[in-house]
Amino acid sequence: WEQRKLGDIADIVGGGTPSTGNQSYWDGDIDWYAPAEIADQIYANSSQKKITGLGYENSSAKMLPPGTVLFTSRAGIGKTAILTRKGCTNQGFQSIVPHRGELDSYFIFSRTEELKRYGELVGAGSTFVEVSGKQMAVMELMMPPTMREQQTIGGFFQQLDHLITLHQRQPFLHSTPEI
């Protein structure tokens, strides 16, 4: 394995919020995530709030591609989810956009606990702790030298997460009365 800086294998992208006082910026069709929406799920499929194209154009929100790993950077540092379709976030994120061919989305998602510990360690702030994009970009990670190895490791954790999800649902399925 080799040591790499996160910023060398991914773009770290912050978010933004359109003015809440302008109704023409809201209730559109562009996904716009807030940290409270990121919990224990693996994938982020659709946000609770949506912004319009006008809201996007008039804010510092950035369009993130599918495969981006959303990373909460304040108020609960270190919650992650993988975007399944393009979307935006508010400023409570420093999202990880993997460079094609250099970083596998599920591999970096599988390192959530390491990302969280790092964010909590380097985060600063007097009102609430926050980790910046620059701080995230210099995070050192031990990485397999090839994308194929990352995908193999990421695939293993993906199967493991799938099994865990199935087992968590199993008691519910067995406790449902027959109709």
What positions do the PLM features span?
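Amphipathic alpha-helical segments with low aromatic content
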Residues: 1-2, 146-179
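A short beta-sheet element
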Residues: 28-29, 34-36, 43-113
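A short glycine-rich beta-alpha junction/loop motif
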Residues: 73, 87-94, 127-149
